[in-house]
Amino acid sequence: MKRWLSRLVAAVLLVAACPAPSPAAPGAPVVRTVGDPRAADRIVVLVPGVGTTPENIDRGHGGVRRRSPHWQARQLHTACGGQVAVVAWLGYAPPGGVDLAAVRSERAVAGATALTGYVRQLAAARPDATITVIGHSYGSLVLAYAAARLPVQVADLVVLGSPGLDVGAAEQLDTEARLWVGSAEDDWTRRIPEVRILGLGHGADPGQPSFGARNLDVTGAVGHDGYFLPGTTSLESLAAVALGAS
């Protein structure tokens, strides 16, 4: 009972600290492709999170290059030796910041439907390809809601800097794909309360051993948005998964 009350208090405080959510207006999907997914044997789809917009998908949120999904796609493509086509996909409206929209799941649910449709199109165009989907930040929640509906060509799901997946264990995602979790030691999402009450918060930390996911070595990653930095074990680990390592 004491634990439940502490979680309730945490949820109430979290909501009290957040402004009202801004309206979602995803518009047309914005996609950046590095390599040719129509010809590649392996394809990666990157799903970005909080603060990503069509205007900053190339330059990065706040003008910070490592936050750019397009830049991240280029780093992963290079780390894979050019053997993998990498797509930065922005087909939903991420929360603009750590606000009420970010602690709720409506945008992730809507985004999951769009993501599922996009990945199915990729699989239909290239049925023999192996696909990996990587969700960063709130994008990991989009991935979680899409997991059970993704095509069989999706062999691996990777979540980075996740605020939670709205489930208590990996098996609840109802997918045959392998689930990998990476979280940098100084990623602020590690401090998020493991709360999901009245539709607020995203629940258990998927990086905990009890969750049942595979641990991804992200040594060298910096903060919440440094998972694709060149020369890091983190980027090497992502490339290994994309190339089919077990």
Question: Whereabouts are the PLM-identified features?
Answer:
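Short beta-strand element of the alpha/beta-hydrolase
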Residues: D41-V50
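Lipolytic serine-hydrolase domain surface
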Residues: P37, V50-T113, A123-A129, R149-S246
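Gly/Ala-rich beta-loop-alpha elbow adjacent to hydrolase catalytic centers
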Residues: I134-L143
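Short, hydrophobic alpha-helix immediately C-terminal to the catalytic nucleophile
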Residues: A144-A148
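Short alpha-helical segments and helix-capping/turn motifs at coil-helix boundaries
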Residues: G27-R32, G60-G62
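Secretory targeting and sorting signals
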Residues: M1-P21, L157
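Short beta-strand-to-loop junctions in surface cap/lid or active-site-entrance loops
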Residues: V31-A40
